[in-house]
C-alpha cells in the first residue's frame, strides 16, 4: 500500500463505521453525491449506492419522503437504520479520524472554512448554472432563472478567483496534504465548464485539478 494511502486510511475500519456497508442514495450527475463516493474511494471504504433521477422527481415520491429524506433531497448516506443528509456531513462521517481531516485544530477550522465556502459561495452559483445549462437547457429556464444567471455567473467567477489566489501559494487548500476541503471543492470545480465557466482563466486551479486526479484510488465522476 502506498505511503500516502496508509496515511489516509490510518485508524480506519469499515466495522467501526457501521454494521453493514453504508448506502449512498444518489443521482450520479450530482457533484454533491460524487464528493461522498470520492471520499470513500480515497479511504478504501465500501459504499453501496441507490440511484434516483432528480429530474424525474424520484426524490419527491411519498416513499422517498417518508423513508429517506423528508426534504426530498440527495445525497443521503444511510448508515444501518440511520439517514444522514448533507454531502459535507457525510464526507466528515466517512473520513472520521483519517488523514483527510487534519489533526491540528486550527487546520481543522481552516478545512471547515473552505467547506462552508463551497456550500455558501461556490456551489450555489457554479453547480446551479451547471444544472440549468447542462441538464435543464437554457431554452427551458423560467424567466426568474434567466434573470439570476448574470449574478450567479459573477459570483461563481469570484469564487473561482478566490480559490485560484489561494492555490497560487500552495498545493492543497489546507496544510501540505489533501483534505476534505479539496474533495468538497473538486466536485463542482472540475465540472464548472459545463456551467459556462472558463477554467483556463485559473491556472492554479488547473494544476490543483491535475493533482487531485493523480491521487491513488481517485475515481472520476460518472
Language-model-derived ranges and their functions:
Residues 115-211:
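GST-like fold's C-terminal all-alpha helical module
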Residues 7, 11-147, 164:
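GST-like domain detector, emphasizing the conserved glutathione-binding G-site
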Amino acid at each position: 500500500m502506498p505511503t500516502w494511502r496508509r496515511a489516509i486510511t490510518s485508524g480506519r475500519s469499515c466495522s467501526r463505521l457501521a454494521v453493514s456497508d453504508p448506502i449512498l442514495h444518489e443521482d450520479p450527475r450530482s457533484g454533491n453525491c460524487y464528493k461522498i463516493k470520492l471520499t470513500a474511494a480515497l479511504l478504501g471504504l465500501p459504499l453501496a449506492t441507490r440511484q434516483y433521477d432528480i429530474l424525474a422527481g424520484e426524490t419527491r415520491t411519498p416513499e422517498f419522503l417518508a423513508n429517506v429524506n423528508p426534504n426530498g433531497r440527495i445525497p443521503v448516506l444511510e448508515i444501518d437504520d440511520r439517514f444522514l443528509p448533507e454531502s459535507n456531513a457525510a464526507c466528515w462521517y466517512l473520513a472520521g479520524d483519517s488523514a483527510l481531516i487534519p489533526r491540528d485544530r486550527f487546520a481543522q477550522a481552516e478545512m471547515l472554512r473552505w467547506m462552508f465556502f463551497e456550500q455558501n459561495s461556490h456551489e450555489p452559483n457554479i453547480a446551479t448554472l451547471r444544472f440549468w445549462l447542462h441538464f435543464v437547457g437554457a431554452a427551458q429556464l423560467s424567466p426568474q432563472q434567466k434573470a439570476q444567471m448574470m449574478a450567479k455567473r459573477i459570483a461563481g467567477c469570484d469564487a473561482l478567483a478566490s480559490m485560484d489566489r489561494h492555490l497560487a501559494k500552495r498545493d492543497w487548500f489546507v496544510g501540505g496534504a489533501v483534505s476534505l476541503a479539496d474533495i468538497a471543492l473538486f466536485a463542482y470545480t472540475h465540472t464548472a465548464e459545463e456551467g459556462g465557466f472558463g477554467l483556463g482563466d485559473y491556472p492554479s486551479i488547473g494544476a490543483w485539478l491535475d493533482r487531485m486526479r493523480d491521487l491513488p484510488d481517485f475515481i472520476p465522476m460518472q
